[in-house]
Amino acid sequence: VEGIFAYWRWILVVLTQLVFYGLPWFEWGTRQAVLFDLASRRFYIFGLVLYPQDFIYLTGLLVISALALFLFTAVAGRLWCGYACPQTVYSEIFLWIERKVEGDRSARMRLDDADFSLEKLVKKWYKHIIWIFLSIWTGFTFVGYFTPIRELAMEFFLTQMSSWELFWVFFYAFATYGNAGFMREQVCKYMCPYARFQSAMFDNDTLIVTYDAERGEPRGPRSKKAEVGGLNLGACVDCTLCVQVCPTGIDIRDGLQYECIGCGACADVCDTVMDKMGYARGLVRYSTQNAMDNKWTPAQIWQRLMRPRIQIYTMILVAVTVGLLVSLSLRTPFKVDVVRDRSTLSRITEYGTLENVYRLQIMNAAENAQTYRLSVKGLPGLKITTDTEVMVDPAQARWIVLRADVPYGSVEGGSHKIMFEIQALGTDEFVVEKSVFIVPR
């Protein structure tokens, strides 16, 4: 299929795959630029290092993704499905390989119906070998987001990969090979939950792929010299090409169906037929239900697209996105946890002071080693008696034992709130953590 929508679909195929296959090979300093290190419980995203305590940012990203999906669906239906969904992307790639090896649809049908021969065997095996190679490469790249990909490549060629790495490479490869090579539209029609609930986000002003029945009916074949209406026929020549090119095999002339992924392939092929017949394009096109009923112009359609529902979705999406970005910009590049030593509530030292013991963890999320200064306040005479400066390696965490005391008898018995202040030397960044100081009654 050739046309404007096929062109944009392939643009997105190329862009998404350049990002997917290329991103793990980029380096940021001495490490991989994007790495989800589950073993060390750290996510590296260029200059950003995230820990389990930063789960709120992942939640925010998921909320943004969901809101974007709602917005795109309300504006133009299953835009994601038709142009950027991995199932669509890899099905397009596998179909392209199939066409290059076996020929167009007619040639593939003839090959399937032909008796067994060396040519048939070679073409089938050649196609599947390319599919399998691409699938394994895809699985390898996927695992490369969780294991440093350069180390993974060395282990792969030296056959030293761990059993779990091998499992996930071939599991993802098998899923790619099966879904894109064989299941294809069955995934969209029966397995994908989005197909079932996406209609709840549609309304009569949502852009969808439509068939202009008033112009196209009654349909029927005719010669190229026949004029529209001359044979009491509409513009549709009943060539069924729109059905043949549809990834899910539906007939758009029967109206919108939940299987439609909004890819526009039927619109492209119909425009090609209209050009050959000398008819106006747009028998199958992106439009809205209200536009079809009221014969709106493109300007009226675009004006109606910015309806209140879309404006609300957009404002919420922008607000959440800005909130997440502001939160990330204000995020301190280190985190602190203070835990009281449960083995001893308090004790009197040889110097006649009352001491409490704490365990303090400092997580340095920066890309360079950092020294931190510790201080405590909240009670008269309260001071730290252990080292007050701690150095932590880049992207590492360190536990230390911290002791604090007050002069004996200077504070009444009970549990007193105190605050530990941890400052990164050479910067204005600091963290304050609350705790308690126990004084026996």
Task: State where each predicted segment sits.
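Short solvent-exposed strand-capping/beta-turn motif centered on an Asx-Ser/Thr pair
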Residues: 363-368, 425
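Terminal connector regions
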Residues: 406-441
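Short, solvent-exposed loop/turn segments enriched in Ser/Thr/Gly
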Residues: 353-358, 399, 413-418
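Cysteine-centered iron-sulfur cluster-binding motifs in ferredoxin-type domains/subunits
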Residues: 73-88, 180-195, 227-274
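Intrinsically disordered, low-complexity Pro/Gly/Ser/Thr-rich segments with frequent PxxP/GP/PP motifs
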Residues: 383-409
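Short acidic, flexible loop segments centered on an aromatic residue
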Residues: 367-381
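Hydrophobic alpha-helical transmembrane segments in integral membrane proteins
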Residues: 322-346
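Membrane-embedded alpha-helical bundles of multi-pass integral membrane proteins
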Residues: 1-219, 267, 280, 284-318
